[in-house]
């Protein structure tokens, strides 16, 4: 376990160090590099593009190390606007209460995800409930949990999404005390 964790951390550090400084366009790119080394982010980073709710669901499920579980999950979702690439992730995140729809029958998959919504989803993924924080104070709770120390706009760019996600790597799950990174390393093949 410790060897695997060390290897993943070393791979993440080497990946970031191997990229020339001028090729990185800020914290979002650095976070994307780290998450890519952990197989949480794949493909083009497009850090300045708006982050959609569908993209956030996919990243959240990967961060939880739950892609295989999501593939097996058959939870019914009432949403008809979820693209094929995100159906399993939305189903899984919705089934666990991490994300909700924007209406009863619409997920809002192509809409930009709000900072508040993603912070709430991260808190829920970590096992926190309405007894611990409310949707209204989700951003404050994320700061309290040290997921972020900076202010974001009302909606997130992909770079912002990557930064918040990378910030969650060292957050501890409420009930187990293990970090997201430790859990991710434990469930990674």
Q: How would you label these PLM feature ranges?
A:
Residues 2-88, 96-155, 169-189:
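Feature responds to low-complexity, polar/acidic, surface-exposed segments characteristic
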